[in-house]
């Protein structure tokens, strides 16, 4: 197993961004964090939004110049697209691509649209990625505390010969090199990100939670207890894992729980599960998932909306809504 090399402040030259204007397209979770961190690092940063965006006034109130996306792209040397995957292609083709040319840089925080050829930039522009491994509010908060969130960075296209230095400088400007950044590729980031979401973090975890809840309720146990044991306490365990790995979690739980972990866990996630994971990974690698998602978005998200409605009606949601009213620490 080959370990990744980490890069820090001393490895990234912030002066690469001197006299450059960076346009942040989008002002959501990541957009506001990138823009404000860049601004605080002394970078000339502007924001590109559609006219009428609810974020327009917010960005201006936070001291940023805001322009319609096409105008921002025309003014910028580097355009960072921080929009949902499914809308990037349309906005890129309409508002950004006409203003890209020799010497300009196109940047992303996720490899999806480049790797799966939803966006195909001209050969004369640099294409890079800087992807913080944390939500925008965390990227912003720890930056203001003098720290940073680890980032991935990658170069897909290096027309200028300076794309890698630009990516590292950008990562430093948003605080990434304070914690450490590691180099990857658009392919590796896109495929591992989708795999993690589908098999573990989102798809795998929610399916496991629901199956556990349903098993207890079908066996006659009270749904409230099933909720506590199969959903509510997930956070307690995950927090321990994030803080110190699986070892800290196991050191913090009872011996009974740890013994059950070792003897029963592998019966739930076994070789059949791993075989299915490999199939899902193959569907990501060969573009099948990307094609399915793009086609559904083009059909006004018909399947996606139906699945969302169905999941919202699962009994665990009603039980959870009632129980969370009892938890004062969850209320603002």
From Swiss-Prot:
List of residues binding NADP(+): 27-30, 53, 55, 85-88, 136
SUPFAM superfamilies in alphabetical order: 6-phosphogluconate dehydrogenase C-terminal domain-like, NAD(P)-binding Rossmann-fold domains
Chemical reaction(s) catalysed: (2R)-2,3-dihydroxy-3-methylbutanoate + NADP(+) = (2S)-2-acetolactate + NADPH + H(+); (2R,3R)-2,3-dihydroxy-3-methylpentanoate + NADP(+) = (S)-2-ethyl-2-hydroxy-3-oxobutanoate + NADPH + H(+)
GO CC field: cytosol
Binding site for Mg(2+) 2: 193, 229, 233
Active-site annotation: 110
E.C. numbers: 1.1.1.86
Gene Ontology MF terms in the entry: ketol-acid reductoisomerase activity; magnesium ion binding; NADP binding
Pathway annotation from the record: Amino-acid biosynthesis; L-isoleucine biosynthesis; L-isoleucine from 2-oxobutanoate: step 2/4; Amino-acid biosynthesis; L-valine biosynthesis; L-valine from pyruvate: step 2/4
Pfam family, one: KARI_C
Required cofactor names: Mg(2+)
Cofactor note: Binds 2 magnesium ions per subunit.
Boundaries of every KARI C-terminal knotted domain copy: 185-330
Record carries keyword Repeat: no
Binding site for substrate: 254
Alphabetical list of Gene3D superfamilies matching this protein: 6.10.240.10, NAD(P)-binding Rossmann-like Domain
UniProt KW Amino-acid biosynthesis keyword: yes
Residue ranges occupied by any KARI N-terminal Rossmann domain in the UniProt entry: 4-184
Domain of life of the organism encoding this protein: Bacteria
Recorded family membership: Belongs to the ketol-acid reductoisomerase family.
PANTHER family associated with the record: KETOL-ACID REDUCTOISOMERASE, MITOCHONDRIAL
UniProt name for this protein: Ketol-acid reductoisomerase (NADP(+))
Gene: ilvC
